């Protein structure tokens, strides 16, 4: 009985500590670019980091345009991402 209780407590703590992060945890500023278009949201295809939306808190997070494998895994594509410096949480882990 104690073993079952310990396993349940350990599982609950693991879920709390390792919970699945959502893409909305790193907020970004959706602004208009100098060319009149709006910045690209995370997971959208891009050619340079200047096209991607910047995070609100630039000291705790960074943005960029990087190559990732999409779900179909045919070839790598460039997508916008925003990452949290402290948690290494990125909003573009898998392509959509």
From Swiss-Prot:
Domain notes: The presence of a 'disulfide through disulfide knot' structurally defines this protein as a knottin.
Modified residues (Methionine amide): 94
Keywords, alphabetical: Amidation, Disulfide bond, Ion channel impairing toxin, Knottin, Neurotoxin, Secreted, Signal, Toxin
Subcellular location: Secreted
Record protein name field: U4-hexatoxin-Hi1a
Task performed by this protein: Moderate insecticidal toxin with probable ion channel impairing activity. In vivo, induces irreversible paralysis in sheep blowflies (L.cuprina), leading to death at moderate doses (9.7 nmol/g).
S-S bridge residues: 39-53, 39-80, 52-65, 83-90
One cellular component term from this protein's GO annotations in UniProt: extracellular region
GO molecular function, one term: ion channel regulator activity
Similarity section: Belongs to the neurotoxin 27 (Jztx-72) family. ICK-72 subfamily.
Tissue-level expression: Expressed by the venom gland.
Source organism per UniProt: Hadronyche infensa (Fraser island funnel-web spider)
Main location: secreted
Coiled-coil segments on the chain, per record: none
Signal peptide: 1-19
């Amino acid at each position: 009985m104690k073993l079952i209780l310990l396993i349940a407590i350990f599982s609950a703590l693991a879920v709390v500590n390792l919970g699945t992060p959502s893409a909305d945890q790193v907020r970004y500023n959706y602004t208009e670019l100098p060319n009149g278009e709006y910045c690209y949201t995370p997971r959208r295809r891009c050619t340079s980091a200047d096209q991607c939306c910047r995070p609100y808190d630039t000291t705790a997070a960074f943005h960029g345009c990087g190559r990732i494998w999409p779900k179909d895994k045919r070839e790598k594509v460039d997508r916008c991402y925003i990452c949290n410096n402290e948690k290494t949480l990125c909003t573009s882990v898998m392509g959509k």
